[in-house]
Amino acid sequence: MNRLMILVFAAVILALASADEDVDIAKRGVPCLCVSDGPRPRGNNLSGIMWMKTGGYGGNGCPKGWHFCGKSRGFFSDCCKR
């Protein structure tokens, strides 16, 4: 079971890292919670997109035209918003 979870996690990371920037960039990736989403009594909106940190992006891990919007930075990824 642990091997299956590791395999699925690795597949998600590879899918996020290979996301093509020019093909509907806002719909790729995993939704994440931005600071501006805030706590709400009926649940939070996930308006950010989780981006993998790669060499082609800025120091914050977000693509051009996007900004970091999360509460804390991840080791492999950041929550970014357009």
Curated annotation (Swiss-Prot):
Upper lineage is:
Eukaryota, Metazoa, Cnidaria, Anthozoa, Hexacorallia
Q: Name one Pfam family in it.
A: Toxin_4
Origin species = Actinia equina
Listed name of the protein:
Delta-actitoxin-Aeq2b 1
Query: Which family does the UniProt entry place this protein in?
Result: Belongs to the sea anemone sodium channel inhibitory toxin family. Type I subfamily.
Main function: Binds specifically to voltage-gated sodium channels (Nav), thereby delaying their inactivation during signal transduction. Causes death to crabs.
The transmembrane segments are none
**Signal peptide start and end residues:** 1-19
Disulfide cross-links: 32-79, 34-69, 62-80
| Keywords linked to the UniProt accession | Cleavage on pair of basic residues, Disulfide bond, Ion channel impairing toxin, Nematocyst, Neurotoxin, Secreted, Signal, Toxin, Voltage-gated sodium channel impairing toxin
**Location(s), subcellular:** Secreted; Nematocyst
Gene3D superfamilies, per this entry? Anthopleurin-A
Where is this chain primarily localised?
secreted
Q: Which residues form the propeptide?
A: 20-26
Quote the SUPFAM superfamilies the UniProt record gives: Defensin-like
Q: Name one GO cellular component term.
A: extracellular region
* Alphabetized GO MF terms: sodium channel regulator activity; toxin activity
Query: Is DNA-binding among this UniProt entry's keywords?
Result: no
Keyword presence, Phosphoprotein: no
User: So which domain of life are we looking at?
Assistant: Eukaryota
